[in-house]
Amino acid sequence: MKKLLEGKTPANEIKENLIEEIKKLKSDGINPTLCVIEVGDDPASKIYLRVKRNLAKKVGIKEIGLHFPANTSQAELLEKIEDLNQDPSINGIMVQLPVPPQIDPRAIFETIAPEKDADGFSPLNLGRLWEGQSDVIPATVRSILTLIDYYGIEMAGKNTVIIGRSVIVGKPLAAVLVERDATVTIAHSKTKNLSELTKNADVIISDVGKAHLVTEDMVKEGAVIIDVGMNRENGKLMGDVDFDMVAPKAKAITPVPGGVGPLTVASLMKQAVILTRKQHGR
């Protein structure tokens, strides 16, 4: 391993830049405001929400938290989102996932106004990514791009394998990397001979949630490895990549924890500020 792609340093830089940017907006009478909706009482969600709220407070974003009971109907939730869409004091809206089974996440993504879409999951914003026209990008995707840019990883012409096809990471990531002239292959649970794809990859990005999915024999010498997976095994947090075995072969690799993770909430706050600026013609 020649380079460890740690995310804490670039995340701190984003936070410091946001503090200054938000101070300037507030001096012009603009107060970035993010509404975060929680449905139910998922323990993991509460931890993540606390991190979001703490960072919002630190950088100067006004965070409005709305909590709905677990038995809330989809119609009730969507009606509230529609109200927030019309509220000019709200710049960004996000719903903490997962939501209870009676609520379809796709209906949420379709209802949040694209101009207030803090998560970047609305169909219109995702479609714009394929046209290279959107600066509204899902937070995890923005985090990966930040690492690529911060560490000067060249993507043009690189054979890039993305493992995972979710609308949250895999698909939008493919769109933005194609715009950067990467040659992108998306692999998934039905992909045959995954190792044949990864052995020829200059860059491997995994977001599956399966420990030890990417092993040393699947990676060529000098590849760049970005691990987005989050798994817990024997009380230890780890990614999709067998880090100890793969790292010696890699040109650069993210640790888990400490790689993409530290950037995700900072990226979400950055998106809230981008939305605020766009709404005020900045």
From Swiss-Prot:
Pfam families, per database record: THF_DHG_CYH (PF00763), THF_DHG_CYH_C (PF02882)
Residues the entry annotates as binding NADP(+): G164, R165, S166, S189
Keyword NADP: yes
CDD domains: NAD_bind_m-THF_DH_Cyclohyd
PROSITE patterns: THF_DHG_CYH_1 (PS00766)
Purpose: Catalyzes the oxidation of 5,10-methylenetetrahydrofolate to 5,10-methenyltetrahydrofolate and then the hydrolysis of 5,10-methenyltetrahydrofolate to 10-formyltetrahydrofolate.
Quaternary structure and partners: Homodimer.
Protein name in UniProt: Bifunctional protein FolD 2
Organism: Lactobacillus johnsonii (strain CNCM I-12250 / La1 / NCC 533)
Protein encoded by which gene: folD2
